[in-house]
Amino acid sequence: MSGARPAADGRPRCPWGLSTEDYLAYHDTEWGRPVHGDDALFERLCLEAFQSGLSWLTILRRREGFRSAFAGFKISAVAEFTDADKERLLADAGIIRNRAKIDATLANAKVLAGWGEGELDALIWSYAPDPATRPAPRTLGDVPAVTPESTALAKDLKKRSIRFVGPTTAYALMQACGLVDDHLADCVARGGGR
């Protein structure tokens, strides 16, 4: 597997971030940077679930459509969505119109609306491993798809009635939200926001 490679500006990046401008911007400014706040984490949780079985680029390019369709991923607003809203979502070409994923998003919002402020943030971040125990990956082959922490997080979320989040999706969430820094050792973005 490949290590960091130079982008057009000559600075080394994770290879996956070089394929499109959308990926490059996401790689450089978002992925692996700490995300906090229940609504912000709910958005990432939902988008990671919608990505399941698809490319992340598909989700990135529809992210604004998702934000519009799901009331900016404000938990309290999505929790109030009705059957008419669900039908609207199923007809919205700006998002992924997968009934199971839409149902899970609406059900998850209803569950999370009953949690206290900051509870989702605290729960997710409680699974962040100690960075000192994780060596910087040198190649993409060194980056896991699942870890004991992501497996435990997925199990905990499921126990709390959060749907459509298995260990792989939980690990992708951990990567995207900065719980782990899986930028390659030589990548210019490694350590960003820490």
Stretch-by-stretch model annotation:
Residues 1-194:
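HhH-family (HhH-GPD) DNA N-glycosylase catalytic core used in base-excision repair
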